[in-house]
Amino acid sequence: HLVQYGRGCRFNCDFCSIKAFYGNYLGQRPIKDVVKEIESLKFKHIFIVDDNIFSYKKQAVEFFKALVPLKVRWSGQVSIDVTQDDELMKLMQKSGCLSVVVGFESLDKKSLIQMKKGWNLRYGGYSEAIKKFRDHGIMVYGTFVHGYDHDNLDSFKYNLEFAIESKFYLANFNPLTPTPGAPLYDRLKKEGRLINDPWWLSPDFKYGQAQFYPKQMTPEELTEGCFKARTEFNSYSNIFKRSLDLKANFSSPYHAAMFLASNLISKREIRKKQVDYL
């Protein structure tokens, strides 16, 4: 079940159109209304679809406290700075948090700065943040974008190896997408680097297909590099390697079942959704 508590995000990443859509608006539904909605659900496993549940710490604390008596299991999207508050992490675990989606995006400092996500570097490093999630039994779904001006063909390998070594529950390796309304789109359009504008209206658009000209690879190499990284991450051997995590991925029978089911579904969907010319 999908449940929404709040809208908007306090950050302004270069590739994201959320700020263009909501502006500086950060709003939450009354917690009592969200609780009532969850109580009406028969199956108590939910995905909280907020762009960033941790947009405001005070509201996040109040929300997590309200979830505790509901005995719900939940997943959602958070920014990496949530790991800086140990008490909040304990509360997340107590409230039923099973997994989080975290936008790591890149291991390259220059790329993070260009995408206006340099704040990812402020919190003791990725490894320390991942450890804190795992120490609280929370599985991590890491996402990466490829195609920024400092990215090259080696970037796929580095991000893939990092995701496997970190034993991410799931991971996605996406081509940078110039979404209308995002600063990235305006910049690439001004530089004449869009392949097909407006690409989102094209009947030829396929999932995972690069829509601009990167600086250090061809669009075809960007598309193929992301596809190969997804495929390798979801190989049976790497699924097995990532399952060897008794703190999070296999910390309980429920975690283990969710890990295996999600990875097998992901493996199937990669082939099903990918562009057909690869």
Briefly describe each language-model feature range.
Residues P183-D186, R193-L278:
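Radical SAM enzyme core and accessory elements
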Residues I164:
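Catalytic-core region of carbohydrate-active enzymes that cleave or remodel glycosidic bonds
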Residues R73-S75, Y141, L170-F173, F240:
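Acidic/polar loop patches that form or flank catalytic/metal-binding clefts of enzymes
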Residues H1, T143, N249-P253:
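Structural motif marking the loop-to-transmembrane transition
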Residues F11, K58, K110-M115, H146-D154, ...:
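Flexible glycine/acidic-rich beta-alpha junction loops that bind and position SAM and/or redox cofactors
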Residues H1-Y141, Y148, L153-D154, E161:
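Radical SAM [4Fe-4S] cluster-binding motif and immediate context
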Residues E87-M92, K116-G124, V140-Y148, G181-K189, ...:
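Noncatalytic linker/hinge segments flanking ATPase motor cores
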Residues A20, I38, K167, G192, ...:
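A general structural signal marking secondary-structure boundaries and capping sites
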